[in-house]
Amino acid sequence: MTENIEQLLHKFPLLNNMRQYEAIDWINPEFGEKAEIPFTQAEVFDVAARFKRFAPYLATVFPETQKTNGQLISPLIKIDKMQSRLASLNDAEIPGNVYLKADSMLPISGSIKSRGGIYEVLKFAEHVATTETNLTYSDDYAILATPEYHKLFADYGIMVGSTGNLGLSIGMAAASFGFKTTVHMSVDARQWKKDMLRANGVTVVEHNDSVSVAIAQGREEAAKDPHTYFIDDEGSKDLFLGYSAVGIEIQKQLADDGIFPDADHPVFVYLPAGVGGSPSGVSFGLQIMMPEGIYPVFAEPTHVPSVTMGMMTHLYDKIAVTDLGIDGKTLADGLAVPRSSKIAGRVMRTLLYGAHTFSDDDIYRYLAMLADTQGIYVEPSAAAGFTAIVPTVNEFKNKAALKNATHVVWATGGKLVPDDEMQKYYDKGRELLDEPQQILAR
C-alpha cells in the first residue's frame, strides 16, 4: 500500500476507531448513485440456466438435492421469536419483520459457498465435457456421473485457497466428478472441515498463515500445470456470478410472502463479509432482480474489517487490515480474510448501503439465541448479520418506511458442523448470555 497511513487516518476518522477494535457503523455515501457495473442480468440468467442443466447430475450424485429436483435452494424463514428476543436484548425496537435466509441448510456443503463454489466447478466440468466429448447443452447431464466421464475428468485438477467453506463446497463438488482436487487452507480453518475434505478424497494443504497466503500459494502451484484449474476467491467472475443467481430465488420467496421491495417497503439484507465475494454477488443479484428498495449491509469482525476498510478508503484490495496494525484474528473463521477481493469493493461502490463491525462474543450470543428461539443452528460467522440490525434501524433516515421493513439475515453456514463442535459454540453463547447451558437437540 502506497497511501500514507497518517493521511488516511485524518481523512477517514472511523479508521481510528477500527484500529482500536471498536464496533463501528458506516453508511456508504455513494449508495444508490449511478455507476457502470461489469455484470449484467443476462449473465445472472445464464448462471440459472447452467444450474438447471446440471440439476439431473446433482440429483444423481447428491441424493439430498432430489427434494428440490437437483436445485440448490435454501428456505427463507420468518423468525418472530428471534426478532422479539433480539429487540429485548438490545433494549430496542425492530420495526417490520425479520427473516433468516438459511443458506446454512443448503444441500451438499451447507453454506453460501455452495452457490459460487459449486457453480464454478460445474462450469469448468461443462467446459471440459463439451470440449473433449460430444456433450451438448440439450443432453441429460446425469450422463456426467458415468465412468466414461469420471475417467475424463480425472485428467484434470481443480485447486482453491480457502478458510473453510469455499474449500468444502468446491472440494465436494469437484471430487464428485473425479477431478484431482486440492484445497489450500489457512491457519484459521477448522480441523473438522479439513477432515471432511480428506474423507471425500480431497488433498488438503495446510498453511500456517492467512487465507491470502493460502490463495497465493494455490494460484502459483496451479499455474505450473495447464490441466489444473484454479478457482480464485480474490478475483473470480464466475464465483461472483454463481452467488448472484440467488436473486432470482429470493425474489420469488419474498413475493410468495407478499413482499415487493420499493422505497416505502425497504428490504435490508445483512451479510457476513470475509473476502467479500459472496455477499457482493448476492447483493448484486438481489439488486439486478429488484432494482428498488434493497439495502445490503455487510457485517465484519472488529479484528478483520477488510471490506469495510477497503470501501471506505476506496483502496479496495490495495489495503489490508494489517497495514493499520489490526491483527486479523477472529473466531469467525469464514471471515478471517485480511484483504478484500479484487471484485467486491469496485462492484459494491454504489450497491452497498452500509457496514457494521462486531466483537466475536456477539456472534456466539446470537448463535445461541437463534438455537433457543427458533431451533436453528448455525456456525459463528453465520450469525454475524444479527449484529447489524439494530444499528441499521437506528441509522436509517426514512423512519416512516421502517414499519414496512423486511430484515433478511443471511445465515451463511452450519449444516455440516459436527454435533460436538456445535455444542461448544452453543455453550459459549449461553455462557456469554449468562444463561444455563443445555444439550442441543439438532
UniProtKB/Swiss-Prot annotation:
The modification N6-(pyridoxal phosphate)lysine is found at K113. Pfam families: PALP. Its cofactor is pyridoxal 5'-phosphate. GO terms for biological process: D-serine catabolic process; isoleucine biosynthetic process. InterPro entries: D_Ser_am_lyase, Ser/Thr_Dehydratase, Ser/Thr_deHydtase_PyrdxlP-BS, TrpB-like_PALP, TrpB-like_PALP_sf. GO terms for molecular function: D-serine ammonia-lyase activity; hydro-lyase activity; pyridoxal phosphate binding. Coiled coil: none annotated. It catalyses: D-serine = pyruvate + NH4(+). Keywords: Lyase, Pyridoxal phosphate. It is an enzyme of class 4 (lyase). Its EC number is 4.3.1.18. The keyword Transmembrane helix does not apply. It comes from the Bacteria. Belongs to the serine/threonine dehydratase family. DsdA subfamily. PANTHER family: D-SERINE DEHYDRATASE (PTHR48078:SF9), THREONINE DEHYDRATASE, MITOCHONDRIAL-RELATED (PTHR48078). HAMAP family: D_Ser_dehydrat. This is Probable D-serine dehydratase. It comes from Limosilactobacillus fermentum (strain NBRC 3956 / LMG 18251) (Lactobacillus fermentum). The gene is dsdA.
